[in-house]
Amino acid sequence: MDKLWSENNKEIQKLLTKEATFKEAIQKLLAFREEMFEQITQIVSGYPDEAFAKMPFAGADGYHSKTLAYSIWHIFRIEDIVAHEMIAGDSQIFFTHDFHNRIGAPIITTGNELQGNEIAEFSEKLNIKELYLYVKAVKESTDQILGDLTYKDLKQKFGGDVKEKLIRSKCVSENENAFWLIDYWCGKDIKGLIQMPFSRHWIMHIEAMRRIKNKLCKIARKGVDPVAYCGFSCNHCFLSEWCGSCRTKYNVCSFATCAEDRICPNVKCCKEKDLDGCYECNELENCNKGFYIPSNDGANAAKAQALYIRKYGKKEFLKVHDRLHEKYDFQKTQEVLGQDYKEGLRILEET
């Protein structure tokens, strides 16, 4: 489990035990959920739809053996059911906003009953954009419910009537891999449900999603030119675990994710000019497109690297990057190459 997330969760659970620190606990919980949800947002906004049905760890023992789509669905179907059927006692977001049809899901359950290739087949049927809108709505609704809780509410337990309600809802499969959830939830008070599923459950599955997307990016980059169009080295980029490079569909570089068509302006320009990269362009020194826009603090560092490639070639560029990382401790090249591309080029040449 992510060490920082684990420590954060432990602190929140500890604060929940005392009335004097209850409000602080809820505030920290909401902030923590926002932090974790941002990871889901980045994954949904950064990767192609095909990524969400892939199982790079199929057959493995663990949550990472699922798909990205299944993981998202599972987290929030459980949350929607628990938050509304049990705690709020009202209707699920899934039904009130017609997300069943909007997402195109063949089931209404948590998905625990699905095994192996069933998970991939299920994932392929989902509309990822609508799925994201659903989970965002669930998250916001749950946050409101959590924010309205009092310390006394934490001890509220759930009787047989709630159990029967859950069974009647058909939102939990009768399959042995799923039906146990009803007894599990009904055996907890609200404080226990805050832990599972509103916090720790998120941690486990979002961590699994990170493993899945890291593997997908690694697979996507296999055999692909590690030098980006703008002149960066994907092998040395601090986003290397998140990004599959701008030469694949798994590009999550900032200028790709910000672009309306998810294509970096530098990539688009190079393709229009039939160039391998900006380093082949005779307008490079004066270029203000994409990564080279003056307001970008990494513009001159990128330009310095592109100029180095033009002068010495890609192989030597990758070697100088190795030496640069041996000599300096940094994440972003602008920390070393500075804000003047001529000075940055000089540093590269002297490294």
Question: Which residue ranges define each predicted feature?
Answer:
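Short, contiguous alpha-helical
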Residues: 1-10, 54-113, 140-143, 147-148, ...
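Short glycine/proline-rich turn/loop motifs
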Residues: 18-21, 115-125, 180-190
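Alpha-helical packing segments of well-folded alpha/beta enzyme cores
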Residues: 25, 29-43, 78, 124-127, ...
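Short, solvent-exposed segments of well-ordered alpha helices
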Residues: 27, 31, 58-62, 66-69, ...
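Short, contiguous, well-structured surface segments enriched in hydrophobic/aromatic residues
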Residues: 35-46, 50, 175-176, 241, ...
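A generic hydrophobic-segment detector
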Residues: 141-190, 308-351
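Cysteine-centered metal-binding/redox modules
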Residues: 220-351
